[in-house]
């Protein structure tokens, strides 16, 4: 556990050179090796699924909609499904292996030994990023034939239609393929029972609608980018170098991979060395004991409403946010986004600590939580994308993937905020050491 795939390390392109955001030319070769429709769900492994899921439910406005635990006949693990719009989070923790009947597990890829090693190394963390495909079996075969490291072969679930399979993504995180039969009820996977009557679901809703992107931190970009591109066929959607995003003290390099529809986005970060301070990416890798999911970006339909609801709960069981930018940031904002945001909206952005960036296609509004667990690793990003509306073949409107970019103009502010947070933690450790 905690080591990069040997398959990933063995596949090295002839040349890997980042050109930076300014020189990067975006194109979509439509090169997927198997159809990828959307993010299906994210599964977190933790020590206590009940309380962890309740904290995320309260903090993000995601009600509990389905469960698989002792009450449903599952003696292997407790899993609780939260949902808001198309966004699905699953939280899984094991029961005692000595009392469990492994065949009762609703997620057949669950492993007691893997869970124990995973949570010991990483604490609360993302175990699986699931994508919906036409056929889990076909996607798995196509991926493995192109170098993907197999984790769990295809399994057909209890409804005899839904199937899942897993391959290595990075670190101890897996990419899970999910295909649903024509009879799927849309709730989740067979073996999960629906909770409640839907009334509470309507009441607990802060406006979050889907997963926009899942960001991974890795020691080295080159082998991981090449590994993922080779077995998925995903293309490079964007890239950033330390010169694009760094501060005077630390930095990163980043590549964003996308599927054909550009609605499944996988940004990947590596640390930069030789700076005054250790890169935040390296800090993550140290505390996470290896590569893993750094943050999940969640799309909201109204970021002002979402942030008002989340901030009301920050001190009472919800999530805290990174410090807001200085007032000068917002004084300069009107010249950058005044044609998209009204004076009242810019004022609301300052009040809530929302960052704004834009590219030649659209505008991005974003904000970041502090780490959501005990370790300074995993955090959440809340975003709203404005613009880039397109018509599909049926004449329906949709928003182009990645509209407004990934906040290149805000990386500096984010890094400064994280640096100050890390300095605060370090000062506490130094004080404690001096007093010992």
From Swiss-Prot:
Q: Which domain of life is it from?
A: Eukaryota
A GO MF label? metal ion binding
Chain segments annotated as transmembrane: none
Q: Name one GO cellular component term.
A: cytoplasm
Record's keyword annotation contains Repeat:
yes
Query: What is an annotated GO biological process for this record, any one?
Result: L-phenylalanine catabolic process
Reactions this protein catalyses: 3-(4-hydroxyphenyl)pyruvate + O2 = homogentisate + CO2
The segment(s) forming the VOC domain are 38-194, 210-370
Q: What is this protein called?
A: 4-hydroxyphenylpyruvate dioxygenase
Source organism per entry reads Plectranthus scutellarioides (Coleus)
Taxonomy-wise, where does this protein's organism fall, top ranks first? Eukaryota, Viridiplantae, Streptophyta, Embryophyta, Tracheophyta
């Amino acid at each position: 556990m905690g080591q990069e795939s040997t398959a990933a390390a063995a596949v090295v392109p002839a040349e890997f050179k980042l050109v930076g955001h300014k020189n990067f030319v975006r194109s979509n070769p439509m090169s997927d090796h198997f159809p990828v429709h959307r993010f299906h769900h994210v599964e977190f492994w933790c020590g206590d699924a009940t309380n962890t899921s309740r904290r995320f439910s309260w903090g993000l406005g995601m009600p509990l909609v389905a469960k698989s635990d002792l009450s449903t006949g599952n003696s292997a693990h407790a899993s609780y499904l939260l949902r808001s719009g198309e966004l699905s989070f699953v939280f899984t923790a094991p029961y005692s292996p000595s009392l469990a009947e492994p065949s009762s597990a609703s997620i057949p890829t669950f492993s007691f030994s893997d869970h124990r090693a995973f949570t010991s190394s990483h604490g609360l963390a993302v175990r699986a990023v699931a994508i919906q495909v036409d056929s889990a079996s076909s996607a798995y075969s196509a991926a493995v034939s192109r170098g993907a490291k197999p984790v769990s072969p295809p399994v057909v679930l209890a409804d005899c239609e839904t199937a899942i399979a897993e391959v290595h993504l990075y670190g101890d995180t897996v990419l899970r393929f999910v295909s649903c039969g024509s009879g799927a009820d849309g709730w989740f996977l067979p073996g999960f029972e629906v909770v409640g009557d839907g009334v509470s679901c309507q009441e607990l809703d802060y406006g979050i609608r889907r997963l926009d992107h899942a960001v991974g931190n890795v020691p080295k970009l080159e082998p991981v980018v090449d590994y993922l591109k080779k077995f998925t066929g995903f293309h490079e959607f964007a890239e950033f170098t330390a010169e694009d995003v760094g501060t005077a003290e630390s930095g990163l390099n980043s590549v964003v991979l996308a599927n054909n529809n550009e609605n499944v986005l996988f940004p990947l970060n590596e640390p930069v060395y030789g700076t005054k301070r250790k890169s935040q990416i390296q800090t993550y890798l140290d505390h996470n004991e290896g590569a893993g999911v750094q943050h999940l970006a969640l799309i909201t339909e109204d970021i002002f409403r979402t942030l008002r609801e989340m901030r009301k709960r920050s001190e009472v069981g919800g999530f805290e946010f990174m410090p807001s930018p200085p007032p000068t940031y917002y004084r300069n904002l009107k010249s950058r986004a005044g044609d998209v945001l009204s004076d009242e909206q810019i004022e609301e952005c300052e009040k809530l600590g929302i960052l704004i960036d834009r590219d030649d296609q659209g505008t991005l509004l974003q904000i970041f939580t502090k780490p959501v667990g005990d370790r300074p690793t995993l955090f959440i990003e809340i975003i709203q994308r404005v613009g880039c509306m397109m018509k599909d073949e049926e004449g329906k409107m949709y928003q182009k993937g990645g509209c407004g970019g990934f906040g290149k103009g805000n990386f500096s502010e984010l890094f400064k905020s994280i640096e100050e947070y890390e300095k605060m933690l370090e000062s506490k450790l130094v004080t404690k050491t001096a007093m010992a």
